[in-house]
């Protein structure tokens, strides 16, 4: 089941959970989508600023599998 997250802080909290498995990053011309797979939900965060997206990508937990989709 998908759920959209509006705040970056909430997304980082979800990324640090034990049941978080993988993150897919989808880049567009206008925005970047971060999709994190947890056991029950697929959480999505849409970031419109490319610099913020790069900072968020670097602040993801190191044990998480990151896959970039174009």
Curated annotation (Swiss-Prot):
Highest rank taxon of the organism: Eukaryota
Gene Ontology MF terms: structural constituent of ribosome
Keyword annotations from UniProtKB, A to Z: Ribonucleoprotein, Ribosomal protein
Entry GO CC: cytosolic large ribosomal subunit
Statement: the UniProt record of this protein carries the keyword Amino-acid biosynthesis: no
Pfam families attached to this UniProt entry: Ribosomal_L38e (PF01781)
The keyword Ribonucleoprotein belongs to this UniProt entry's keyword annotation: yes
GO biological process, one term: translation
InterPro entries: Ribosomal_eL38, Ribosomal_eL38_sf
Similarity remark: Belongs to the eukaryotic ribosomal protein eL38 family.
UniProt xrefs under PANTHER family: 60S RIBOSOMAL PROTEIN L38, LARGE RIBOSOMAL SUBUNIT PROTEIN EL38
Protein name: Large ribosomal subunit protein eL38
């Amino acid at each position: 089941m998908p759920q959209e997250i509006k705040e970056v802080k909430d997304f980082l909290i979800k990324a640090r959970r034990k049941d978080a498995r993988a993150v897919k990053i989808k880049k567009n011309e206008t925005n970047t989508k971060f999709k994190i797979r947890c056991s029950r939900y697929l959480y999505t965060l849409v970031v419109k600023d490319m610099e913020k997206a790069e900072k968020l990508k670097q602040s993801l937990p190191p044990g998480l599998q990151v896959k970039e989709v174009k």
